[in-house]
Amino acid sequence: MKFTVLSLFPAIIKPFFENSIMKKAINKGIVSFELVDVRDFSKDKHKRCDDLPYGGGAGMVLKAEPISFALEHVESAKKTTIFLSPSGIKYSQELAYSLSKREEIVIICGRYEGIDQRIIDLYVDFEISIGDYVLSSGEIAALVLIDSVYRLLDGVINPNSLLEESFGVKNGLLEYPHYTRPYDFKGIKVPEVLLSGHHANIKNWRLVKAREKTKKNRYDLYLKYLEIIGEDNGFDKKN
């Protein structure tokens, strides 16, 4: 998969591709990337890419021309173009799985008040929000999306990890608690079942704890889980 990022500040993005698991994925040929500096496509002598909004209001808006030139520079018939914005559809693990099946993802990083709507109308396949909050940097949102997608690609991480983690394809629950050495930390001991070696009991304990955590922290996901399994198995639907 190729990630292409259009940004006014590509230096924010670059280190992510040069470290840790992402670097290994690139070395294996699983992932490639291109960083496009939108300023390089500005016709303004000062390389400005923003202007005042029509209709008035606070802040500046990214101009259509440099972004359109940058997008046309990215030659690929198989690209999926994404603009990250608080006004977009809410991002989810399900959408991350869907995007992981694409061949190339092009991400437009927003700044200031946003971008000219005509870019969204003409070029964007998905306008996505990573949550109900506002960031000053679209680059941070881009890193969230990239990280959530590339880790789902074959050969990046252990596929069994994807089954058990939060929002996993197995059941959609939040992940169960984890413990490691020491056995006793400040008077809190590791649950005995995890030391028993009894795999069926451990599996059942983890499911129970995952359900409890999901019910407590994300009741919406818990109700969705109950709909999927078609029963509550003793877990009532009341708060």
Curated annotation (Swiss-Prot):
InterPro entries: Alpha/beta_knot_MTases, tRNA_m1G_MeTrfase_C_sf, tRNA_m1G_MeTrfase_TrmD, tRNA_m1G_MTases_N, tRNA_MeTrfase_TRMD/TRM10. S-adenosyl-L-methionine binds at residues 110, 130-135. Keywords: Cytoplasm, Methyltransferase, S-adenosyl-L-methionine, Transferase, tRNA processing. One of its GO terms (cellular component) is cytosol. Its EC number is 2.1.1.228. Its main location: cytoplasm. It is found in: Cytoplasm. It comes from the Bacteria. One of its GO terms (biological process) is tRNA N1-guanine methylation. One of its GO terms (molecular function) is tRNA (guanine(37)-N1)-methyltransferase activity. It is an enzyme of class 2 (transferase). Homodimer. Belongs to the RNA methyltransferase TrmD family. Specifically methylates guanosine-37 in various tRNAs. HAMAP family: TrmD. PANTHER family: TRNA (GUANINE-N(1)-)-METHYLTRANSFERASE. This is tRNA (guanine-N(1)-)-methyltransferase. It comes from Borreliella burgdorferi (strain ATCC 35210 / DSM 4680 / CIP 102532 / B31) (Borrelia burgdorferi).
